[in-house]
């Protein structure tokens, strides 16, 4: 009777590779990190599973995943989705910020209210209460860009320079010279502090 199984690093995006999990009905911990698993992930019913990590995979559809997990893993208490597009994180995408991550946590807790830990952070009472009230509204929806919008919008490259300085013939430069050179052996970190400030 196996209770712990790690299939990390198999780099298998094939659904058939997880079909054998149905033989492990008493499984309590399942680690599926670094496997290139996508939105077509299908887990068998695992009624005793309380820990599931799906870090660094290719999961993008959060709602579909959470609905599936609610159905097949009723005892789930610990879930980690770090490193997936579905988990907005500043380390994975520069477009995401802390507010995106808070909305994500709220939505996950709304869908899976029995979680005690999410992405290695303990679920707080305040997060749980907010998920009950606002969780249904925290689903992140982005409009799909139609091919007409992409074709009709001119391509612009961002530049921090004023428009006048972008001309190819109007290059300007600045040359400066440092007037002070430190030749001493000691730090001058506090040379601006007067004796009466010590």
Swiss-Prot record:
<keyword id="KW-0433">Leucine-rich repeat</keyword>
<feature type="domain" description="LRRCT">
    <location>
        <begin position="96"/>
        <end position="134"/>
    </location>
</feature>
<keyword id="KW-0015">Albinism</keyword>
<dbReference type="InterPro" id="IPR032675">
    <property type="entry name" value="LRR_dom_sf"/>
</dbReference>
<feature type="repeat" description="LRR 1">
    <location>
        <begin position="2"/>
        <end position="22"/>
    </location>
</feature>
<keyword id="KW-0677">Repeat</keyword>
<dbReference type="Pfam" id="PF14580">
    <property type="entry name" value="LRR_9"/>
</dbReference>
<comment type="function">
    <text>Required for melanocyte differentiation.</text>
</comment>
<feature type="repeat" description="LRR 3">
    <location>
        <begin position="48"/>
        <end position="69"/>
    </location>
</feature>
<keyword id="KW-0221">Differentiation</keyword>
<feature type="repeat" description="LRR 4">
    <location>
        <begin position="75"/>
        <end position="95"/>
    </location>
</feature>
<protein>
    <recommendedName>
        <fullName>Leucine-rich melanocyte differentiation-associated protein</fullName>
    </recommendedName>
</protein>
<feature type="repeat" description="LRR 2">
    <location>
        <begin position="26"/>
        <end position="47"/>
    </location>
</feature>
<dbReference type="InterPro" id="IPR001611">
    <property type="entry name" value="Leu-rich_rpt"/>
</dbReference>
<dbReference type="InterPro" id="IPR043313">
    <property type="entry name" value="LRMDA"/>
</dbReference>
<dbReference type="GO" id="GO:0030318">
    <property type="term" value="P:melanocyte differentiation"/>
</dbReference>
